[in-house]
Regions:
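A short, proline-enriched helix->beta-strand linker immediately N-terminal to the Walker B motif
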Residues: 81-85
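Hydrophobic anchor residue at the start of the ABC signature
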Residues: 12, 76
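Conserved ABC ATPase signature
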Residues: 62-66, 70
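Short helical segment in ABC ATPase nucleotide-binding domains corresponding to the A-loop/adjacent helical element
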Residues: 25-33, 43, 47, 60, ...
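Conserved H-loop
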Residues: 116-122
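Conserved ABC ATPase "signature" region
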Residues: 40-58, 110
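Catalytic Walker B motif of ABC-type/P-loop ATPase nucleotide-binding domains
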Residues: 87-90
Length: 186
């Protein structure tokens, strides 16, 4: 994947990777262009991102004072601090419990819509891919093996139990099973 402006790419990893000696506000602003913004603009940016991610009361807190979901929100805010147009999300919700994961998925969709940004979201969860993606790519040996278009015709929030979603899920699982069977034969 090539980006015309790689500096506009924000990255959120599976683990938040926050610096424990920095407050949440300092962690969020770590990737911001400090030459481009005055101190007052940076403070305003931090407040905006804290509010956007629902962390406005925790700007002065340190990572060890936060839950896993809160730390992932902070990691998302940090990715947005660099004025990202696109997000690369590498299994950011994999380590979260079911309910926190659901909340983060909804927050992620809301933030992408509000900020009008695109994302490449890596996940091993078929359900998560169906809930969040418009296009689902299944990788095989470092290349795209299969491509499914969910499309924008399925509005958010999506219902995994709808006939249409169940049909798409069956196709994806069948593809994964066939691929798994092929690999076993070698």
């Amino acid at each position: 994947i090539l980006f015309e402006q790689p500096e506009k790419l924000g990255v959120v990893f599976q683990e938040p990777r926050l610096m424990p000696w920095l407050t949440l506000e300092q962690n969020i602003l770590f990737g911001a262009d400090k030459k481009k913004h005055s101190k007052s603009k940076l403070k305003e940016k931090a407040e905006t991102l804290l509010r956007l991610t629902g962390l406005e009361k925790f700007g002065k807190a340190y990572p060890d004072q936060l839950s896993g979901g809160m730390m992932q929100r902070a990691a998302l805010a940090r990715a947005l601090a660099c004025d990202a147009s696109y997000l690369l999300m590498d299994e950011p919700f994999a380590a979260l419990d079911h309910f926190t994961r659901q909340t983060m998925q909804k927050e992620f969709l809301r933030i992408c819509a509000e900020e009008k940004m695109g994302a490449l979201f890596v996940t091993h969860s078929v359900d998560e891919a169906l809930l969040l993606g418009d296009e689902i790519l299944i990788m095989e040996n470092g290349k795209v093996g299969s491509w499914f278009t969910i499309g924008e015709n399925l509005a958010y929030p999506r219902d995994l139990l709808s006939e249409e979603m169940i049909g798409i899920k069956r196709k994806i699982i069948k593809t994964l099973e066939n691929r798994s069977q092929t690999q076993k034969n070698f």
